[in-house]
Structures are given as C-alpha cells and as structure tokens.
Amino acid sequence: MRVLVPLGKKQVTGIVYRHRTEPITNDSIQIRPILAILDTTPIVTPHQLWLWEWISRYYLCTMGEVMAAALPSGIIDDNYKARTVTYMDWEQGMTYEQAQTLVLRSKKQLAMLQYFVEHYLPNKGIERRELIEGSGESPAILRALVDKHILQEVKTSVSRLIPYQGTIKPAFALNDKQQRAYQQIQLSWQQHNTVLLHGVTSSGKTEIYIHLIQEQLAQGKQVLYLVPEIALTTQLTERLRRIFGNQLYVYHSRFSSDERVEIYNEIKNSIVEPQTQKAKLILGARSSVFLPFQSLGLIIVDEEHDSSYKQQDGTPRYHARSVAIMMGHHYHCHVLLGTATPSIESYYNAYQEHKYGLVTLAERHAGIQLPAIHGIDLKRQYHRKEMYDHFSDPLVERIREVLEQGKQVILFRNRRGYSSYIQCSKCGQVLKCVNCDVSLTLHKHRFIQVGEEQLTCHYCGHTQTKPSHCPTCGGEWKEVGFGTERIEDELYSLFPKARVGRMDLDTTRNKNAHQDLINQFAQHQLDILVGTQMVTKGLDFDNVSLVAVLNADSLLNTPDFRSYEKAFQMLEQVAGRAGRRGERGEVIIQTFMPDHPVFGFLSQHDYVGLYQHEIAERELFHYPPFYRLIDITLKHRNNDRLLAASTLLQERLHQVFGDRCSPIIVPSVARMNNAYLRHILLRIEGYADIQRAKELLMESIHYVQSIRNCLGTIIIPDVDPM
C-alpha cells in the first residue's frame, strides 16, 4: 500500500515493498517516520511487485522508475477526482400531494414537478440536467422547488467509463484453415508456453484470437490483448465490443489520468469480486502489461514485430513483448504472438530454436489473393520526365482509374510535415533547431490557424516562423524533401475532386482524431488516405484497391542492422491494406533501387526468404539473436564533461569486456534538447551469463558517475535496443 514519507525537504509517495525484520546496527543510518498511510487496502498485487522487480533487474533501472511508469499518475500523486453528477430527489418526508399544494400558483414549477414525477427513478431520482432540459424550464424554477424543500440535490459519484448498450452478437465461425490453426495453437501450448502465429495479412488471425479469448473467459480467466499503436484500438474496439460487451476494457495513454485510475481500479476490483463480468478482456498498448491482473489465462501480442512495443525514451526501456512472455511464465498462462511479418528474433526462437511453437496461416481469408506488387523505377521516370512532383505518371494514371471505379487509395510516406528542411538557394544555409543538432522541418498545414509557415523540430518540439529570406545572405529558400503535407497538396492539384485525408501525428493529436479519420475512410467519406506508418498497422477497410509507397528507399537507407527487416515489415504490412475484400488488391512501390533484394522478397511475399538472408548476416556480424545488445547513452549539457565521462566509461568497459565493447559512437543527432549525446554498444554472446554482464556494466556506470569530473552525466543503459 502507499505511504507518504519524507525525502530530504520533500514529501513523496512510495509503496511498501518489504518489511525489514533484522535490526539496523549502522549508527550512520537515520530512520525517519512514515508520515501517513494512504490506503486501507493494497493498491498493487504481489504479481505486480514481482514483475516490477524483474523489469528493474532485466532493464537496469530502479523499482521506483518502474512504479512511475506502471501506475496512473492519479494514484501516485493521490490527486484522483471522482466524477460527480447531481441528481434531484424528494426532500425527506415530502409527498407528491404536499408538493402540489406548494406549487399551485406557479405553472412553471408545477410543470417541472410533473416532469420529475413522470421520470423519477426510485432510490435514484433524476439527473439535474435532464430535469431542466426535459421539462423545458429554467434552473431558477428548479431552485424554487429546492427552496420550498420539495426537492433536494444529491451528488453521486459516477464512472467515466461509458458502458456498452448495443446488441451482443456471436463470433463468426472459423473456416477450415482457421480451425486447423486454432487446433494447432492449442496443441502447441501443451509443449510451449509461447506460440508464434505467422499468418499473412487478412488471413483471419483476429477471428482466431476471438475464439481463444472466448475459451478463456468461459473459464473465468482474464485476457490481455496487446496492440502496438493506439490507432489500432479504434476499429478493434468496435469489433470486440459487439462480441464481449462490457467484459472489454480499453487502456492507453490517450485516456485522462482519472479515466486510467478508474480502469485500473475496475481490474483490481475484479480480483476481489471474481464473479463480476467486467474487466475480463483488456485491450491496450504496451503499458497495459502493468495492470493488476490476478487470473490471466492468455496474453495476445498482436503485430508482435512492431517496434512500438519498445519504450524508446525515459525509463524503464522495456519491451512489452518480452514482458508479456515473462508474465506468461509467472502467471502460468498462454502467450500468443501474432503477425504477418515476424521479428527475426521471434521467428528464430520458433523456427530454429523451437523455444516457441510455430503455427502458419499461408492464405488469405475467403481465398482472396495477396496483392500484386509492382515497382516503378524513379530513375527512369525522372530521366523520361514522366513525373509530376513526387508522383510518377504510371502511378497517377493508376490512381485515376481506381477512383473512377469508386474504389479507395492509401498512400504511404513515412515522414510528416511539408518538407524535410529548407535551404538557402544562394549560400546553402540550412535552418537548424536552437536546442538540437538537427534541421527544422517545414510545416504548412499543422499551424494553419497561425496563418504562417512554421519550422518545427521533431525532437524537442521547438517551433519558429519561417523567415521570408535567408538571414545570412538574403537569398531565397528552396524546399528539400517531402512529407505527408506536401503529398496532400499535390493530390489536390492532381485530383481536385478527390476527398483526401491525412493520418499522421499532427492530425491525430486529439483524443478522438484517430476514430474520426478511420470512420470517415471506412464510410467512404474520403477517397484517398495519406499517412505515415499509422496507415500500415492493422487497419481493415473493405474498399481499398490500391496502396502506393511514394519513396521506399528512405526505409532502407538508415544506419541500422534491422533496416532491411523493418523495411520489409512496413512495406508488407501497408501492402496488406489492399484488396482485403473481393478482388485482388494492387501495390505500387516507387524506388530508385528496383533491384534491391528486399523488393525481390516483397514482390513474392517471401518472408522466409528474407529471414534466411537476414539470419546469415546477423550471425556473421554478431547481432541478435546470436548476440545480446546493450546500448549505453551518455548525456550532459557540458560537452567536455560528456567527453570525459564517455572516455572513462569506454575504457573501463573495454577492460572488462574487450572487443565486445564498441568505441565511443557519435550519433547522427549529437545534441538533443541542449544535451550532448554519446553512445557505447555492448555485444554479449547469447550463451554468456547476461545477468553477470549487466552487473559488471552497472559497477562501471556507478564508478564513472562518482568521479568529480563526470558529475551530472546521465547514463542510460538500454537492454535489447530497437
């Protein structure tokens, strides 16, 4: 349970983890009293505390840092406020007959009283707002009834969680191939705690999930259904709600702190009241692994390959898939990893190491063919002058044909904004962020209410107005690179009658923005949807005939050993949005490298070919799954202090780990938010004692942080970086 304790001059909230039984003999240790016990019952379960401890050990952080990530802020800060609704009820002892005699001279008071009587609910009354709006009378009339002691106001706490009031429908029956996969999963669970379901896009994996969920709920178990992006919960929530009703709860960061507290408490209370039908199925993003489950029967990790499952900033830098697998062992529950494009590590564990079971769904539902994938050589198109801005002539013509057929189009560009940066056409100056060593991105539509073009840093959020001319030489600006905003403008020029929507971080900042865009496209209120990677993930639209990737090369040209894997996954996933119902879909990929091996695997939807290519490279160059990686980030606002700390740490680690320790790495963005950055990478053999390696690493980190010349250096180890 939570306690309030003094820490220096502050008061902080903590959770009692253990009782110390042995006496303290060290006189230098000062015992300070607990100021207050904040709870009468435990706020976390023993299962959660076990998980927090495992995460802190594995990801090299403190349990306090895990707690801060795990609990809604309203619980930690004790600032949760219940939502109250005012109801009107009879004043004690008042009867209808008595009330009539008190309002005979006022027709308005009598009218409101009549409405109250007609809509009165025993032991509850009627909501104040409903009484005013329903009767058509003013608040002053209601105040008169209160002043006459006819009615009284009763404030009642109500949930912010809106119950489902629609019709519950049965799940669809599985077809033969789905039924076979369902049975294979059940058999695999007899030997493996974790099973990988490798099913091509639109093969019906979600239907299999639903039947597995039903089986667990029938046994009184809880199910955690993880998705990598909040956007994915939108369509999926509607689908699951129609089957599971109020057993389904959704949990992610777009909810307010108070809403998250209420969901957390509902799940915790379902432990106390196991007969309740609420909070049995939890659909959520990665932070859902921290909820207070007690009787987990199944964890589903959908799109298990997605890097969004990894916490990239702050601490703990956990991976929800790894946490889910560990939870499966602790709770003795099944874990199902599902995807059309498995991570190399997961496929290796299933296909070669047999640590996981492996079940394959190789065909789409209802016999629909996988989309045909065509490449367009941009070098040839530019040479022939067959381009309109960033659209090749063949792509423009194909979009026109699809729109004329009444079908829809998805365009993918994994860069938001209008232009990547602006550059002086005379002196070559590029405007950079004042806080970071990175160029500013031009936005034209995000700040439309400002009426000016804006330059924004996508790292720290710094924004400034675009100057009319170069501040150095007065030259004109040229716009370099293109993002989703520019594509949107070009589409309006090419297809002035088309209804175009844009899905990126800028258009989906509001709580319901994802839902609104998805609904508009699903209801065919939009013809073309332009988007970043949000459009690649799990969305299911009936009428999409064509998907186009405007520049696939940017996915491949990154300094990341996973770049080919990630490019294949992203392109195969976005291709999977085409032709999900009825006729076969089509995918057009614009590239300057049409002969790249990734496009060869992609054109055949050959994941296994890509895997075999990648796994050989990984083994040769000492990367996962054969080696474990720990990326150490060092930060300091003083570059000299940072250099001293990074040099000392690298020397100590090299003494301990030898060539497993890299030289100091200067990142492409070497200063972020006014802090200078350096990296050191550790490669540890898969067969080595990784926990001992972590202990040696932390000893070196603590030593460096104790050196006077290195004080203030923030050192963050990232275990299994993405």
Residue map of PLM features:
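Conserved nucleotide-binding/hydrolysis modules and their immediate coupling elements
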Residues: 1-43, 126-128, 454-459, 471-477, ...
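Cys/His-rich short segments
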Residues: 390-391, 395-396, 401-494
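Flexible beta-alpha connector loops of hexameric P-loop NTPases
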Residues: 41-44, 249-257, 306-318, 381-388, ...
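Conserved interdomain linker/interface between the two RecA-like ATPase lobes of SF2 helicase motors
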Residues: 323-338, 343-426
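Conserved RecA-like helicase motor-core motifs
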Residues: 224, 244-255, 434-437, 441-443, ...
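Accessory helical-bundle/CTD segments and flexible terminal tails appended to RecA-like ATPase motors
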Residues: 74-100, 379, 497-499, 510-529, ...
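Accessory, non-ATPase domains that flank or precede helicase/AAA+ motor cores in DNA-metabolism machines
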Residues: 1-339, 351-368, 656, 681, ...
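Conserved helicase motor
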Residues: 227-232, 249-262, 284-290, 415-416, ...
